[in-house]
Amino acid sequence: MSSYSSDSTAARDQHAPLLRPRHDGSFSSSSSSARPTALAVLLGRITGHRAPSMLVRETAARALEERRIDWGYSKPVVAADILWNAALVLASAVMLVGTVEERPNEPIRVWICVYGLQCLFHVVLVWSEYWRRNSTRRARDLESYDHEDYNIEYDYEQDSDDNSTTYSFVKRCESINTVISFIWWIIGFYWVVEGGDKLLGEAPNLYWLSVIFLAIDVFFAVFCVVLACLVGIALCCCLPCIIALLYAVAGTEGVSEAELGVLPLYKFKAFHSNEKNITGPGKMVPIPINGLCLATERTLLAEDADCCICLSSYEDGAELHALPCNHHFHSTCIVKWLKMRATCPLCKYNILKGTTDQS
């Protein structure tokens, strides 16, 4: 683990948070973030990186999942999702009404009807979750405003627990609907193939509508699988790209430039300073900020002289930042991370609150 080799425990107790502790009432859009995501667990099993770097990648995977869910329930995406599925429901209804004279040799009409009902159920789930998120956000903002006026402490933990329960129920319903849709797709594919030319001749409109629905599902399934593979490869091989992406879409969860200026800044000096571009055991020499030296010189062991974000060893002269929890990283790497999330990527220590994020 990238930690200082001397007096790390005592130094941790002496460090105070950059800012005084504050209540954070923001409810994470992903209530399941308290548990490792499937992608994070998979990364932990298939990659060969050592433990600290794997922790960073699992944290990045959870952050990416939270961003994905937040983006998935944004107004434009929800509107597009509802309109798309509503169009499928409308197409199913119009086709079922307009083809009453067709007599297919397979129960393809039943398949189209159930397919439309599944789309409608998906619309209900998406809208209910979107409405719940907006209602919770408005209620929380109003409660926070009122409680600030009257110095009343708001029970954010209870609010988060209630929302987690509701979110879990919606997720279970969506998962069940996805499984049923997959099974129903297989049944529809079988009926279309079994019907063959006879189905095409007796009910051409129903046949082609079924083929279109099946093709749409295949397209989205392939797209999601390819996207998940690309994200997994990026997390394993190019974490800085993921951090840059998260930083580009980050909200207000990170730290400001003024808060970053409080962090101790070091320059790594290899023990064999007469050789250039050498990596390995060395020491962290503090760099004065505004004429003040905020830290003391630290010695690093060989296994600690690398950055767990970019997986690169510290080169002689590299600038490093150290967090109050004693973990250290390349300055450029950790600055991008902290602007996205105000927690240590290894131990989840929140540099604003002075506490460890248990999620």
From Swiss-Prot:
EC number of the protein: 2.3.2.27
Membrane-spanning ranges: 77-97, 110-130, 176-196, 211-231, 232-252
Keywords: Membrane, Metal-binding, Transferase, Transmembrane, Transmembrane helix, Ubl conjugation pathway, Zinc, Zinc-finger
GO terms for MF: transferase activity; zinc ion binding
Bilayer topology: Multi-pass membrane protein
Residue ranges with Basic and acidic residues bias: 10-25
Gene Ontology terms: cellular component: membrane
Positions of RING-type zinc fingers: 307-348
Region Disordered, annotated ranges: 1-32
Tissues in which the UniProt entry reports expression: Widely expressed.
GO biological process: embryo development ending in seed dormancy; protein ubiquitination
Top-level taxon of origin: Eukaryota
Gene3D superfamilies according to UniProt: Zinc/RING finger domain, C3HC4 (zinc finger) (3.30.40.10)
Name of the protein: E3 ubiquitin protein ligase RIE1
